[in-house]
Amino acid sequence: MNAPKELPHRATQNRILDLRDERGSLEMFTPLPRVLVTCATGHMSEAFADGWITATQRLMERDQTVSVFNEWGQMASYESGARRKLTDWMLSHRTRFSDTNFTTNSRIAAMGVSVAGAAVALVSIKVELHTREEFLRRLDVTLRGRRA
């Protein structure tokens, strides 16, 4: 598969997951050892959430924190079970996140990010929803080895 056009080429190095069905897609990359980039389109299913959890197992076992960038600009909807699974995944790996960044154009996806963000904020995981421009700026800074 080709790298998503929504992301800079250097963010799509080292693909660790590529799931597709008739309703959507989920791609995941680790362009640097401590950076996880996801790109979701269409509908986020529980099967996609299960794939996410499996694909990131080794990454979460490392003794280091990870910056997560979720490009969900083309994601239109999600199953509530997928949101629950990914929220539980974040909670179970809460010491592994340095920052978690999202961009989306969907009100439904933004609502899901807000609900999950409220749940994980209780254990000091910061979830930030950005404009596309700010998301790309932060991703660029992180890929260059600096923090935004």
List PLM regions with ranges.
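Amphipathic, Lys/Arg-enriched alpha-helical "gate/interface" segment within cytosolic domains
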Residues: 2-148
